[in-house]
C-alpha cells in the first residue's frame, strides 16, 4: 500500500512539473519574452493542492515524452524570436495576466499533440456575458477547459500563514483565499453551465474537464516568519517583502550585488540585465530617496554578475510603504 501511494505521489508530482529537468533553462536564454515564455511553461505552480483540479496545460503534449524537444524549441526561438514578438504585438493591454495568457496561447498553438480549440471564449446569455473560458484544448487525454492565472502574494507579518486568506496581493485588492474560492465557485464551473454547453457543442466538444493552472511567487515577511499557505507546492517560487523602515537592516543581511526595481512587465522570469545595463549603487539610492513614502509596492531585484558580464537575478523583494497593508475600507 505504501509503495503504491508513493508511486501515485511521484506520478502526481511529475504531472504537475512534467519538465523539471529544464527548470534552469529560463536563466540560460537571452530574449526577455522567450525567457518569460520558458518561465511560464517550466516554473512550478504556486500550489500542489488548490482545493480544485489542477493540470499543467502541456500535460498531454508530445513534449512531455521528450522534454529536450521542448528545450530545443525554446532555444531555437531565443535565436529567432520574431514569431513570438509578432504574436505578443497583438496585445492591446499591459496587464500581466493577459500577457501570461498570451504566452500560453502561443505555446499551445505550437505544442505537438495539442489542439487549441478556443481562447478567451465569452459565454453569453443574450446580451449578458456570463463569463469567459480562458483556454479550451484537445489532447490525447481528452478535451479540457483551463483557467490560467499568474499571481504574486505577500504573506502575513504575524498570524497564520497557512490560511490562504492571509496572503495579500501587493495592492491589497486580492487575497489567495478569495482567488481560490472564485476559481472553484465560479470560473471553473462556467463550462458546465447550459449556455456553455451550446458554445462547446459548436466547437465539437461534448464533455470537458475544467482545471486550473496557477503560477507565480509567494513573498515571505522580513523580519519575521510566515508559514507557507496550506497546499503550497514544495518547489514554489519565493521572495521576501519588507517595509521601507527595514530596508537598511535588510541590506546588512544580503550578499553583495546590485539592486534595481523591476517594471511590471518584468515580473515573470528571473531578471537578466546585459553587461553595462545594471544600476549603480548611486542610481538606486537616488531612486529610493525620490520614491514617495506611500508609493505602491515596488518589486526589487538583486543582481549578481555572471561570467559573461551580464547580471542575473539572485533574489527578489517587495518593498512596501510603512503603512502597508492599506486594506480597502480599512
List PLM regions with ranges.
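Intrinsically disordered, low-complexity Ser/Thr/Pro/Gly-rich regulatory segments
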Residues: 11-330
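N-terminal amphipathic/basic-hydrophobic helices that include classical n-h-c signal peptides
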Residues: 1-15
Amino acid at each position: 500500500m505504501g509503495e503504491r501511494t508513493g508511486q501515485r505521489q511521484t506520478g502526481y508530482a511529475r504531472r504537475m512539473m512534467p519538465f523539471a529537468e529544464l527548470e534552469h533553462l529560463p536563466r540560460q536564454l537571452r530574449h526577455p519574452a522567450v525567457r518569460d515564455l520558458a518561465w511560464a511553461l517550466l516554473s512550478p505552480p504556486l500550489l500542489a493542492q488548490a482545493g480544485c483540479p489542477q493540470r499543467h496545460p502541456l500535460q498531454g503534449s508530445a513534449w512531455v515524452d521528450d522534454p529536450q524537444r521542448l528545450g530545443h524549441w525554446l532555444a531555437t526561438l531565443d535565436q529567432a524570436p520574431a514569431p513570438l514578438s509578432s504574436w505578443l504585438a497583438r496585445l492591446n493591454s499591459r496587464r500581466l495576466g493577459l500577457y501570461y495568457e498570451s504566452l500560453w496561447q502561443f505555446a499551445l498553438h505550437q505544442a505537438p499533440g495539442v489542439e487549441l480549440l478556443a481562447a478567451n471564449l465569452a459565454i453569453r446569455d443574450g446580451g449578458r456575458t456570463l463569463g469567459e473560458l480562458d483556454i479550451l484544448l484537445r489532447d490525447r487525454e481528452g478535451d479540457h477547459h483551463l483557467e490560467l492565472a499568474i499571481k504574486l502574494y505577500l504573506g502575513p507579518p504575524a498570524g497564520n500563514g497557512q490560511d490562504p486568506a492571509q496572503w495579500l496581493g501587493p495592492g491589497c485588492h486580492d487575497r489567495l483565499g478569495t482567488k481560490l474560492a472564485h476559481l472553484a465557485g465560479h470560473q471553473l464551473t462556467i463550462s458546465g453551465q447550459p449556455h456553455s454547453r451550446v458554445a462547446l457543442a459548436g466547437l465539437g466538444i461534448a464533455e470537458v474537464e475544467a482545471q486550473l493552472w496557477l503560477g507565480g511567487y509567494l513573498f515571505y515577511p522580513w523580519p519575521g516568519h510566515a508559514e507557507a499557505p496550506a497546499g503550497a507546492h514544495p518547489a514554489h517560487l519565493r521572495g521576501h517583502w519588507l517595509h521601507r523602515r527595514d530596508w537598511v537592516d535588510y541590506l546588512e543581511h544580503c550578499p553583495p550585488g546590485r539592486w534595481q526595481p523591476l517594471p511590471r512587465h518584468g515580473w515573470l522570469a528571473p531578471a537578466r540585465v546585459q553587461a553595462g545595463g545594471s544600476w549603480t549603487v548611486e542610481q538606486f539610492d537616488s531612486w529610493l530617496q525620490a520614491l514617495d513614502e506611500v508609493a505602491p509596492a515596488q518589486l526589487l531585484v538583486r543582481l549578481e554578475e555572471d561570467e559573461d558580464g551580464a547580471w542575473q537575478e539572485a533574489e527578489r523583494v517587495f518593498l512596501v510603504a510603512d503603512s502597508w497593508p492599506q486594506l480597502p475600507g480599512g
